[in-house]
Swiss-Prot record:
Name of this protein: Adenylosuccinate synthetase
GO cellular component, one term: cytoplasm
Function in brief: Plays an important role in the de novo pathway of purine nucleotide biosynthesis. Catalyzes the first committed step in the biosynthesis of AMP from IMP.
Higher taxonomy: Bacteria, Pseudomonadati, Pseudomonadota, Betaproteobacteria, Neisseriales
Recorded metabolic or biological pathway in which this protein acts: Purine metabolism; AMP biosynthesis via de novo pathway; AMP from IMP: step 1/2
Length: 432
């Protein structure tokens, strides 16, 4: 019997993880964010009301449910408190009482944001597409062992000494490499002194609490951010995020042993999207792509940036299934494909020199040279919006899902036919 479930994005992010985590949270005893920062939004729609979460786990809307931010997450205290205030204003109960933050979480502070934005501006046409929220520099500090972490908020007398050393490093870069102004220690301390009284009570030994919950038989839900193809190691590098987005990162990022991860649910959009720069073999530049973007409301929930749209890429998904050990797939936004007369599925790529491959190559340069090989299927005219039974889906929609299973080599467990929590078809429940 599966007890703990990891939910990850199996493409380039924006697959609809938030809705599915919110839906699964009904049966969970705790929901955990284990990587990323506030650079991506998870959108939930409950009873027609939309909520966008960036740092707080998507289970927070369930009254009484404990939520956790593991040490793999880089936390902006200001963004976190802003999100809490939004939830409080919306009537969500006891947010601060139910949210626990690992003491080992690196903090995102003003100098991270300043350097992130200065670097991106300096890249010119070579921009990576960072959100400019300081995520990358914060992860750099973690690896370089100079991060200011959540636990440091409990010891302000030592924090100032650490801050002075960090700013000496940052201001050299800002002033001499990027021709930007320095960040003042007094300004950073003002932020810290403002947020510390509210953040400190939420700091807890997340790893210990999660392991205790597991021993007590409570189901745990691990919520990933971004997508596997943006992973710092296995994504289309350098056009990737700064963290490990794979299912395996749930263990280290939450502080639990890998034996506690029973089921990996890969969230997969019924077509493919990507935000920002980077190779995208199946990208569409015609009216079909424009139609997907319009019907799918393909704009970033945090940045507002338009997402690039393309055909379903089964070869890319194969890579994701391989590196995540995906147990089952949740296909989202099936309803956006309604009315597309002819559908293409990318089943592989032609390579320079005449070769072929049925799986996404590693690295951006290799992917850039790939030419998609398509299979064509008939679409469907009937509406799938809000359909809650697999048998009620159009025959061609079911054939599309079946072909995705066959080409990718993983079963479809869930189908989402709309943004609301209830617009969901369950073929196999991950917690079953």
């Amino acid at each position: 019997m599966a007890k703990n479930v990891v939910v990850i994005g199996a493409q380039w992010g924006d697959e609809g993880k938030g809705k599915i985590v919110d839906w699964l949270a009904e049966e969970a005893g705790g929901v955990v964010r284990f990587q990323g920062g506030h650079n991506a939004g998870h959108t939930l729609v409950v009873g027609g009301k939309k909520t966008i979460l960036r740092l707080i786990p998507s289970g927070i809307l369930h009254e009484g449910l404990d939520c956790f931010i593991g040490s793999g997450v880089v936390v902006s205290p200001e963004a976190l408190l802003g999100e809490i205030d939004e939830l409080n204003a919306a009537g969500v109960k006891n947010v601060e009482g139910r949210l626990k933050i690992a003491p080992t979480c690196p903090l995102i502070l003003p100098y991270h944001i300043a350097l992130d934005q200065a670097r991106e501006a300096s890249r010119g046409k070579g921009k990576i597409g960072t959100t400019g929220r300081g995520i990358g520099p914060a992860y750099e500090d973690k690896v370089a062992r100079r991060a200011i972490r959540a636990a440091d908020l409990l010891h302000p007398e030592k924090l100032r000494e650490k801050l002075d050393a960090v700013l000496a490093y940052y201001n050299v870069q800002l002033q001499y490499l990027h021709n930007a102004g320095p960040v003042k220690a007094e300004d950073v301390m003002a932020v810290i002194e403002k947020v510390a009284p509210r953040i400190a009570p939420m700091i807890a030994d997340v790893s210990r609490v999660l392991n205790e919950k597991n021993k007590n038989g409570e189901k745990l839900l691990f919520e990933g951010a971004q997508g596997a193809l943006l992973d710092i190691d296995y994504g289309t590098y350098p056009f990737v995020t700064s963290s490990n987005c794979l299912a395996g990162a749930a263990s280290a990022g939450a502080g639990v042993g890998p034996q506690m991860l029973d089921y990996v649910l890969g969230i997969v959009k019924a077509y493919t999207t990507r935000v920002g720069s980077g190779p995208f073999p199946t990208e569409l530049f015609d009216e079909v792509g424009a139609g997907l973007a319009e019907r799918g409301h393909e704009f970033g929930s945090v940045t507002g940036r338009a997402r690039r749209c393309g055909w379903f890429d089964a070869a890319a998904l194969k890579r994701s299934i391989q590196i995540n050990g995906i147990s089952g797939m949740c296909i989202t936004k099936l309803d956006v494909m309604d009315g597309v007369e002819t559908i293409n599925i990318c089943v592989g790529y032609e390579l320079p020199g005449g070769g072929k491959t049925d799986i996404l190559p590693c690295g951006s340069d290799a992917v850039e040279t790939c030419k998609p090989i398509y299979e064509t299927m008939p679409g469907w005219r009937e509406s799938t919006v809000g359909v809650k039974s697999y048998d009620a889906l159009p025959a061609n929609a079911k054939a599309y899902l079946k072909r995705i299973e066959e080409v990718c080599g993983a079963p479809v467990a869930i189908v989402s036919t709309g943004p609301d929590r209830e617009e969901t078809i369950v073929l196999h429940h991950p917690f079953a």
